Amino acid sequence: MAGLQRSTISFRRQGSSGIVWDDRLIAELSQQAANDRKGETLQQDEQAKLITSEVQDQTTKPIAGEGLKPIRTDGGMERSRSNGGGAIRHHRNTGRVSPAVDPPSPRLSAFGCCSAFGKKQPGKKVNQRKRPAKRRSR
């Protein structure tokens, strides 16, 4: 039994979804993802170098339009968090909504024997037999 070896080509795994995964395919996908991450970091490093060099170039060059006034971009109305300012929202804001509350269960007696064993409501008094009023002697 010690002489048996697993073939790297024919070995497969079956996932929880029932899809059969080939280990070779999984290895290729993980290598490709790692290479993509390395490529992205190299591109980000190059972009950062370009941006820093552009900033250095701009500081040494004179600005062509020094006499121009800046464009005023503020609107006539300022917004605070309470009237819709702040974070960008892509949904309709309807205000605060209270959480859903389950309605109380109905108090129904289905059968006589079931109502005999049921709990009494705390607000209701037990019906007692009315006794006749005591007569006063004259």
UniProtKB/Swiss-Prot annotation:
Intrachain disulfide bonds: none
GO cellular component, as recorded: nucleus; plasma membrane
Basic residues biased stretches: 121-138
UniProt key word Plastid: no
Disordered as annotated region, ranges:
52-138
What InterPro entries does this protein's entry cite?
DUF4666 (IPR031421)
Q: Name one GO biological process term.
A: stomatal complex patterning
Tell me which residues bear Phosphoserine.
98, 105
Give me the stretches of Basic and acidic residues compositional bias. Answer: 69-81
UniProt keyword terms in alphabetical order: Developmental protein, Phosphoprotein
Pfam families reported for this sequence: DUF4666 (PF15697)
- Which tissues is this protein detected in according to the database? Expressed in developing cotyledons, mature cotyledons, cotyledon epidermis and stomata.
Q: What does this protein do?
A: May play a role in the regulation of stomata patterning.
User: Any idea what this protein is called?
Assistant: MAPK kinase substrate protein At1g80180
- Give the taxonomic lineage as stored in the record: Eukaryota, Viridiplantae, Streptophyta, Embryophyta, Tracheophyta
